[in-house]
Amino acid sequence: MARMHTRKRGRSGSKKVYGVQPSWIQYSKDEVINTIVNLKKSGVPPSVIGIKLRDQYGIPTVKAVLGMKLGKVLSEKGLKDDVPEDLGNLIKRYNNVAKHVELNPKDQANKRGRDLIMAKMLRLVKYYKRTGVLDEKWNLSKVLR
């Protein structure tokens, strides 16, 4: 299957092996939850928390250890962000590109890139509103430059 905004094809990748907790993990459930909470309170985004748990603590997946995903742990502890991380990153990218286009109005390639980022954001907002992650009254124009 092809990628969305390019002519390149997708790349096949390895699949995660889900199942029981691996035998090499030395941490209890409480220690893993405390580590997640401490990392989030220190300002680390959820995707980086997963990478740190994998690389520094030897925990391949939070779901295998705790039985629930990282986002669920954060929402139970009241540490979930108002805007999902992927949408927030797209908003930052859009604002940076929009600022660049204001300074360089003849840069047609980045104008197109800005439009593609906006299209992706609109699709994500529609999905998050449909699934209940974002409130129906949430508006994208409030967070854009």
Swiss-Prot record:
Disulfide bonds: none
SUPFAM superfamilies registered for this protein in UniProt: S15/NS1 RNA-binding domain
Superkingdom in the source lineage: Archaea
Gene3D superfamilies listed in its UniProt record: 4.10.860.130, S15/NS1, RNA-binding (1.10.287.10)
GO CC annotation, single: cytosolic small ribosomal subunit
InterPro entries: Ribosomal_uS15, Ribosomal_uS15_arc_euk, Ribosomal_uS15_N, uS15_NS1_RNA-bd_sf
An annotated Gene Ontology molecular function: small ribosomal subunit rRNA binding
Keywords of the record: Ribonucleoprotein, Ribosomal protein
BP GO terms, sorted: translation
Family indicated by similarity: Belongs to the universal ribosomal protein uS15 family.
HAMAP family, alphabetized: Ribosomal_uS15_A
Assembly: Part of the 30S ribosomal subunit.
PANTHER family in UniProt: RIBOSOMAL PROTEIN S15P/S13E (PTHR11885), SMALL RIBOSOMAL SUBUNIT PROTEIN US15 (PTHR11885:SF6)
Protein name listed in UniProt: Small ribosomal subunit protein uS15
